[in-house]
Amino acid sequence: MEAKAIARHIRVTPMKARRVVNLVRGKQANEALAILKFAPQAASEPVFKVVQSAISNARVLADRDGVAFDEGDLIISEAFVDEGPTMKRFQPRAQGRAFQIKKRTSHITVVVATPEKEEAR
């Protein structure tokens, strides 16, 4: 079973968000939440929320399908950050000049899944 959560237009640069996402990719969901809770990076808060949302989506899918749900079984099978739209702003500088400031945004995607049990032979 797979469940996905996407947060779009998050106001953090994709490079900084990728540093945080790389910490939790492949980990168990509960362990990932613990790592994100104490990570010092500012991008850890939106990633934490996306992981929580993916876990909740998995719970809803399990209830809908009538499957037993255990949060401890979930692992983060996919986690990636795509670049969102860039807001361009201008900073006034001396002698009538203006410097461009690029305020970057990110799209954060997290997929949680239950590992497939090996069939008995």
From Swiss-Prot:
| GO MF annotation terms | rRNA binding; structural constituent of ribosome
Top-level division of the source organism's lineage: Bacteria
Q: InterPro entries from the xrefs?
A: Ribosomal_uL22, Ribosomal_uL22_bac/chlpt-type, Ribosomal_uL22_bac/org-type, Ribosomal_uL22_CS, Ribosomal_uL22_sf
Which Gene3D superfamilies is this protein grouped with?
Ribosomal protein L22/L17
Spell out the PROSITE patterns in the cross-references: RIBOSOMAL_L22
Q: Which GO terms describe its cellular component?
A: cytosolic large ribosomal subunit
Alphabetically list the UniProt keywords: Ribonucleoprotein, Ribosomal protein, RNA-binding, rRNA-binding
Query: Example GO biological process term?
Result: translation
Family of this protein: Belongs to the universal ribosomal protein uL22 family.
NCBIfam families documented for this protein = rplV_bact
Q: What does this protein do?
A: This protein binds specifically to 23S rRNA; its binding is stimulated by other ribosomal proteins, e.g. L4, L17, and L20. It is important during the early stages of 50S assembly. It makes multiple contacts with different domains of the 23S rRNA in the assembled 50S subunit and ribosome. The globular domain of the protein is located near the polypeptide exit tunnel on the outside of the subunit, while an extended beta-hairpin is found that lines the wall of the exit tunnel in the center of the 70S ribosome.
Subunit and interaction comment: Part of the 50S ribosomal subunit.
Q: Cross-referenced HAMAP family, in alphabetical order?
A: Ribosomal_uL22_B
Entry-linked PANTHER family: CHLOROPLAST 50S RIBOSOMAL PROTEIN L22-RELATED, LARGE RIBOSOMAL SUBUNIT PROTEIN UL22M
Q: What is this protein called?
A: Large ribosomal subunit protein uL22
Q: Which gene encodes it?
A: rplV
